Design a protein with these regions (language model features):
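A conserved active-site cap/scaffold subdomain adjacent to cofactor or substrate pockets
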Residues: 70, 74-159
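Short alpha-helical scaffolding segments that buttress acidic/His motifs in well-ordered protein cores
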Residues: 91-92, 136, 171-178, 240, ...
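Mature, solvent-exposed C-terminal subdomains and processed small-chain segments of exported/organellar
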Residues: 32-36, 80-86, 94-96, 212, ...
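Charged substrate- and nucleic-acid-binding regions of tRNA-handling and nucleotidyl-transfer enzymes
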Residues: 234-295
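Active-site cores that bind ATP or allylic diphosphates and position pyrophosphate for catalysis
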Residues: 1-54, 60-66, 99
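Small-residue-rich helix-loop
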Residues: 145-247
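Residue-level signal for inorganic ion chemistry
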Residues: 17, 38, 63, 88, ...
Length: 296
């Protein structure tokens, strides 16, 4: 009933659906009680009654429905939070509906082909943000490098504003390590500016690295980096593995302090080779010399 007291909403809804040739009405279970009213209107007009499919609600948890009023995300919110449209569509399609088999990742065209209302569950579905993160990471990994670089660049540039650092090269380090796009800025901020860090980062048990060994490595790698002709992955790697061999240590004992000095972080996308290549020779050497000063 509208505010003017007339039953125009239900009337218009039935007329509209009939004129559009609607055969199936799919809606939330909260509308189940209104079905008899619609049926009376269809019968009054002498029209065929469509088939009704009433879907169970999507829940925040076992007791509460999702609600924008209570801070649950809308589609627009999820996109703004770094989720891909295709990943959201895929995940939402599986809320309250189950395809046959174990496959979970589907393109929209695949979903259109396999969808059948018989797979709709009578039980409410619970929205699991961690599951959506998993779906999103799978979609990110499946993208072509060029497509990922295109969607990642705006997020890279939030923290890496220096245009001399190639966004596509940085994106290549991120693609297999990113779940949502909004994680990107804090992962790569060290490219734009070397963060403050303590010498304790040079201590790493697995790499058998400590402050003294790190100082020795940096003192020896700097002239080797200075002597490289073509600043590329192959030559940067060769300088480090060659030093490790000459010192009689494993590669990790050389690469750990180089990466810490170059990035100022213990956890980075990419290793010492890729980071040094993107930074360039001059900036890499500058950062390695800063590390030497820290190490005394």
């Amino acid at each position: 009933i509208k505010r003017d007291g007339r039953p125009t909403y239900n009337f218009a809804n039935v007329v509209d659906d009939h004129l559009m040739g609607i055969t199936h009405v799919v809606r939330g279970s909260e509308y189940l009680s209104s079905a008899p009213k619609y049926n009376l209107l269809y019968e009054g007009f002498g029209w065929d009654i469509p088939k009704y499919v009433h879907c169970s609600p999507v829940m925040r948890d076992a007791h509460n429905k999702m609600s924008k009023r209570h801070g649950d995300p809308s589609y627009e919110d999820l996109i703004a939070q770094g989720y891909l449209t295709d990943a959201v569509l895929n995940y939402v399609a599986l809320l309250g509906w189950s395809p046959r088999g174990e496959q979970e990742i589907y393109s929209l065209d695949e979903l259109k082909k396999i969808f059948d209302i018989s797979g709709i569950s009578k039980s409410p579905a619970i929205f699991d943000i961690e599951k959506l993160r998993y779906f999103n990471s799978e979609y990110i990994r499946a993208m072509s490098p060029a497509d990922f670089a295109a969607v990642a660049e705006p997020f890279i540039r939030q923290s890496v504003r220096n245009e001399r650092y190639d966004a596509a090269a940085i994106a290549a380090l991120l693609q297999q390590r990113t779940e949502v796009l909004t994680d990107i800025p804090e992962k790569v901020d060290f490219f734009d500016a070397l963060p403050e860090y303590g010498v304790e980062l040079f201590v790493h048990k697995k790499s058998k690295s400590d402050e003294a060994s790190s100082k020795e490595v940096l003192e020896k790698i700097i002239p080797l980096f200075e002597a490289i002709g073509d600043w590329c992955d192959e030559n940067i790697m060769a300088a480090q593995t060659g030093l490790a061999e000459s010192m009689g240590v494993k590669n990790a004992k050389v690469m750990w302090p180089v990466r810490i000095a170059a990035a100022g972080k213990a956890v980075t996308p990419g290793g010492a080779v890729e980071i040094c290549r993107i930074l360039g020779r001059e900036e890499t050497l500058r950062r390695l010399r800063i590390a030497l000063e820290k190490l005394g």
